[in-house]
C-alpha cells in the first residue's frame, strides 16, 4: 500500500512538472487570439501596385535628364555649388565644366 501511495505521488509530481503552463507562454498574444484580422495581415504583404511603383522609381533614377545630371555634378564640386548660388546651376556648370580641354 505504501508503494502505491509513493507511486501515485511520483506520478502527480511528474505530471505537474510536465504539464505546467509557464508565464512565458501566456505572454504571447497568439495564445488568446491565434488569428489575424485583415488589416494586420495586409500590413506586411505588399501588393503589385507598390512593387510596380518602386520599379518605376528605379527606372526614373537610371534615366535622368541631362540638366539633372549636370546639377548633381555641380553639387559635388564645392566651388561650382557656391557659384551656382549666385548665378544658377546652368551657368555654374558651363563655367566649371563647359569648356573641357583636350591635351
UniProtKB/Swiss-Prot annotation:
GO terms for molecular function: calcium ion binding. Disulfide bonds join 74-80. SUPFAM superfamilies: GLA-domain. In 16-day-old embryo, expressed at high level in the sternum and tibia, at low level in skeletal muscle, heart and gizzard. Not present in skin, liver and brain. Keywords: Chondrogenesis, Developmental protein, Differentiation, Disulfide bond, Gamma-carboxyglutamic acid, Osteogenesis, Phosphoprotein, Secreted, Signal. The keyword Chloroplast does not apply. GO terms for cellular component: extracellular matrix; extracellular region. Its main location: secreted. One of its GO terms (biological process) is cartilage development. PROSITE patterns: GLA_1, GLA_2. It comes from the Eukaryota. The modification 4-carboxyglutamate is found at residues 21, 57, 61, 68, 72. It is found in: Secreted. InterPro entries: GLA-like_dom_SF (IPR035972), GLA_domain (IPR000294), MGP (IPR027118). Requires vitamin K-dependent gamma-carboxylation for its function. Belongs to the osteocalcin/matrix Gla protein family. Associates with the organic matrix of bone and cartilage. Thought to act as an inhibitor of bone formation. This is Matrix Gla protein. It comes from Gallus gallus. The gene is MGP.
